[in-house]
Swiss-Prot record:
Record-given protein name: Elongation factor Ts
Function: Associates with the EF-Tu.GDP complex and induces the exchange of GDP to GTP. It remains bound to the aminoacyl-tRNA.EF-Tu.GTP complex up to the GTP hydrolysis stage on the ribosome.
NCBIfam families: tsf (TIGR00116)
Key words of the record: Cytoplasm, Elongation factor, Protein biosynthesis
Gene that specifies this protein: tsf
Amino acid sequence: MAVTASMVKELREKTGAGMMDCKKALVEVDGDMEKAIDYLREKGIAKAEKKADRVAAEGLASVVTEGNKAVILEVNSETDFVAKNENFQALVTELAEHILAEEPADVEAALAQPFKGGSETVQDHINTAIAKIGEKLSLRRFTVVEKEDADVFGSYLHMGGRIGVLTVIGSSSDQELAKDIAMHVAAINPTYVSRDEVTKDVVDRERDVLKQQALNEGKPENIVEKMVEGRLSKFFEQVCLLDQPFVKDGDQKVGKYVKSKQASVKSFVRYEVGEGIEKREDNFAEEVMSQVKK
């Protein structure tokens, strides 16, 4: 498979490795992106897979709860300035309340629903806001979560909605605990609640990479397995909420802290505005020149 410049660029964004290292990795694995990431990690060139940090959109994440239901959603705008606009913030709240009440299957279904039982659809309502605010606005995603009577919701919005987190804490009515765990999730960004949620494929892949790393470091075969298990524990600490040092008390793990409160973490959802969408990057000099020529 031919290795293209766009493939090299994508691998650089995902790993932070140099251009030539990325090209060599892709050539070695015949263009397979996942294998190229593992190749770079095994060689010690990329410490870990990372997503491109560039953010494509501005906007807000928000959480609304009502009884045993809650919704977390992300609504995008073109600029951070509009994200602070009162009309935009009101739109975000209206959309959250609509989704919580109607529980559409997905974004497409939500946009087609009548808004508040009227003649206009949710998309029509967004279009009205676009005309008023003067920027493209879009409902990007949402998750509706339900809990049992004995559970409690927690929510946390960082930087006014740049990051939004919704947690469900089991066997507890401790709202402060639920919010603290949401705050931790916002700050540390775990992928899973516990090790039980990590699939065998993910663990096997990580174990293979760690083993190859140790062998490439020249470690003796007889101690490689022990090293791998130790490093695998570090991996779980990076991705599993309950294994992480609690952000408000680094001397104890989240799991131990929650257990001390006779509670459990059932689930969490974390939205960071614009994650996974590449933002258009304008050349500043060209932008200035374009204004001068007008």
